Amino acid sequence: MQTLHALLRDIPAPDAEAMARAQQHIDGLLKPPGSLGRLETLAVQLAGMPGLNGTPQVGEKAVLVMCADHGVWDEGVAVSPKIVTAIQAANMTQGTTGVCVLAAQAGAKVHVIDVGIDAEPIPGVVDMRVARGCGNIAVGPAMSRSQAEALLLEVSRYTCDLAKRGVTLFGVGELGMANTTPAAAMVSVFTGSDAKEVVGIGANLPPSRIDNKVDVVRRAIAINQPNPRDGIDVLSKVGGVDLVGMTGVMLGAARCGLPVLLDGFLSYSAALAACQIAPAVRPYLIPSHFSAEKGARIALAHLSMEPYLHMAMRLGEGSGAALAMPIVEAACAMFHNMGELAASNIVLPEGNANAT
């Protein structure tokens, strides 16, 4: 049975030769070189992923939604009742939430995964429960390190099993009342930013309660003393099992050489953890949308990422990842279906990248 260490060790590097071939092919298509902008760079990124066999392509698509409750909810950092996590997880199994509608439109399957809901098991939800809710990070760690490591491995294996069954494009999502608080704590730790710079309103927290949320994040960091150079330490101390789960999807997809679409702020925090745990993950991550949550810009700057969509969204669930899946498919369609300059006897002047 593969260990977490072995999984991380076996993440492949991008295929530079395949990327060079893809760039050459794209430059010969019926358009001025570079005129399709980031669609071209996305196609080249995909071509370098070993799991796609040297060419941009999309097979089956899946959005993995990690669901959990958080002890820090008790600190007054969220307005929604804790039971909403379980209710919405059940709604996801019926296909009625935001991510389900957007994923269906994109032709993707939503996998609803219970990694720590504080309720009885829900029919139709995948059971990977670590505990009924995370610890309250304002008074102690969210979980033990061994729990975090075990969940990272379990989710990574689940992701790789989906890859073996034909999934070639993953999206990550989450569901959990109060989970923007641990996400903000993680972003604060990884980027060295003060809590005031990264704490936002989450699911419509009133402005009058923001200062309390900032204080809770500061207390969580002060009490737990997470090591910013140790991604698992940060996840286990000030994160949450839903954030660990998303990190596991990223590690598993990268191990299989396949792309992962990030969602919003919660996924940025998980991406920071994934890249700290295994820097080789970074080339497999694709940013979908620019979250409207306050700390988004800081997190994305630290990841050196520019999302493809600016939609003022902050729902979470993986909604942005689902919405961006057609962009990935468009990059593949461009690569495979456009005609070539040579076939039409068109010769463009050297350096002509902006005009037809």
UniProtKB/Swiss-Prot annotation:
Reaction catalyzed: 5,6-dimethylbenzimidazole + nicotinate beta-D-ribonucleotide = alpha-ribazole 5'-phosphate + nicotinate + H(+)
Biological process per Gene Ontology, one example term: cobalamin biosynthetic process
GO function term, MF aspect, one: nicotinate-nucleotide-dimethylbenzimidazole phosphoribosyltransferase activity
Enzyme Commission identifier(s): 2.4.2.21
Gene3D superfamilies listed in its UniProt record: 1.10.1610.10, 3.40.50.10210
Annotated active site: 317
Pathway this chain belongs to: Nucleoside biosynthesis; alpha-ribazole biosynthesis; alpha-ribazole from 5,6-dimethylbenzimidazole: step 1/2
InterPro entries, per database record: Nict_dMeBzImd_PRibTrfase (IPR003200), Nict_dMeBzImd_PRibTrfase_bact (IPR017846), Nict_dMeBzImd_PRibTrfase_N (IPR023195), Nict_dMeBzImd_PRibTrfase_sf (IPR036087)
CDD domains linked: DMB-PRT_CobT (cd02439)
The entry's keywords: Cobalamin biosynthesis, Glycosyltransferase, Transferase
Function: Catalyzes the synthesis of alpha-ribazole-5'-phosphate from nicotinate mononucleotide (NAMN) and 5,6-dimethylbenzimidazole (DMB).
Subunit (UniProt): Homodimer.
Annotated family: Belongs to the CobT family.
HAMAP family the record matches: CobT (MF_00230)
Name of the molecule in the record: Nicotinate-nucleotide--dimethylbenzimidazole phosphoribosyltransferase
